[in-house]
A protein has these predicted regions:
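Short beta-strand edge/turn micro-motifs at domain boundaries
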Residues: 100-122
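Short, surface-exposed coil-to-beta transition loops
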Residues: 61-64, 79, 93-99
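A short hydrophobic beta-strand element
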Residues: 73-82
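Short, low-complexity N-terminal intrinsically disordered segments enriched in polar/charged residues
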Residues: 1-26, 107, 125-134
Length: 134
């Protein structure tokens, strides 16, 4: 296993425990995360904390695993599968994905996700979801 994959596995292990600060510790200060093609990227650690909070409010991620990976220099490609439950509908879904990571000095600087956006939508902000249910 390459060094880049070890960093990503540490990030995944932190998230599986819902250790937000452990997750954040694997990211560079200037992290740029493209999660959904219709949304602006999350840039910086504070935006990542906000993203993780919104993601957890929107989805119960029950599984997140790597199926294949390949490294080329500072770039890591990961093919995987996650099992999610949409908290707003209760619908459980298997979500195959590809993630591309760029790393510098042992930290993730860029993350891009590719998946079926017709199945997984961007979660509502927690305050917006509460306002709709009121």
């Amino acid at each position: 296993m390459g060094e880049n994959m070890k960093v990503v596995e540490a990030m995944m292990a932190a998230w599986k425990k819902r250790d937000v600060e452990g997750f954040i510790a694997t990211l560079a200060d200037d992290i740029e995360y493209h999660w959904h093609p219709t949304k602006r990227p999350a840039v910086g650690k504070d935006k990542m904390r906000k993203f993780l909070s919104n993601y957890e409010a929107g989805f119960d991620q029950q599984e997140w695993r790597v199926v294949h990976s390949a490294e080329a220099g500072n770039v890591l490609f990961v093919e995987g599968m996650e099992v999610l439950v949409d908290r707003s509908t209760g619908v459980k879904m298997d979500n195959p994905f590809v993630q591309v990571f760029e790393l510098r000095d042992g930290l993730i600087t860029r993350m891009r996700d590719y998946y079926d956006t017709s199945q997984v939508h961007a979660p509502a902000k927690p305050d917006a979801a509460q306002a709709q249910s009121a």
